[in-house]
Amino acid sequence: MRKITAIVLALALMLTLVGCTTGGSASTTAAAPAADVKSEGVMTYDEYIAAEMDSQVVIEAYVQAHQSWWDNKVTVYAQDYDGAYFIYEMACSEADAAKLVPGTKIKVTGYKGEWAGEVEIMDPTFEFAGDATYVASAFDATALLGTDDLIKHQNEFVVFKGLTIESIAFKNDAPGDDIYVTVSLNGTNYDFCVERYLTDPDTDVYKAVSELQAGDVVDVEGFLYWYEGVNTHITGVTKK
């Protein structure tokens, strides 16, 4: 009888353990993002950041947006799970540029460079890198504005909340060109930009920014570009 009881108890314990293990695994899987596996010879984001200027770099990342294609080149804003990349004038056919929709994974080879504080990949070439997709959510960088930690998120898709519009000006005083947007937070001014090659005059964001007035309070989304300091390339604006 004791032997039968022991066997029953053992079976019950095994079933309990299996149930617990299955439940834990399902919970972990639901919480964790899909693995962003790099191909052989491809740098992690940390390795890219640590690479010397002017050295060759090879990265894999996901297209978040790109500027207008021209002269067989396209400038791409890309991001992986760990950081973001500004890929300047990537060699690309017009047909391939049309395939660079948000989320598309690409492998890029080029040289790490810097211009006015903006770290970028120069002279890049690329190839498509499989079917995996990823579109980043906007990182709320409001609390980092004006701090040394902000640059750690350079080129990421970010949002700044509760900014006050100080001024709106068109490049060369020509509506239809870039829009220079001066915003403030806690008494400090920052220069943002609507890049016409990223969001052209026919886009909703270009029209919305054109109509803003000094004193308006807004939330701003965009890519954390750098030009002698933060110079976010605006992709969305919400007036409060």
Name every feature range the model reports, one short phrase each.
Residues 11-12:
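Repetitive helical segments and hydrophobic/amphipathic motifs
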Residues 21-24, 30-240:
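OB-fold single-stranded nucleic acid-binding module
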Residues 16-19:
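C-terminal motif of bacterial Sec signal peptides marking the signal peptidase cleavage site
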Residues 1-8:
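Positively charged n-region of N-terminal signal peptides that target proteins for export
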Residues 7, 24-25:
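N-terminal alpha-helical "arm" segments
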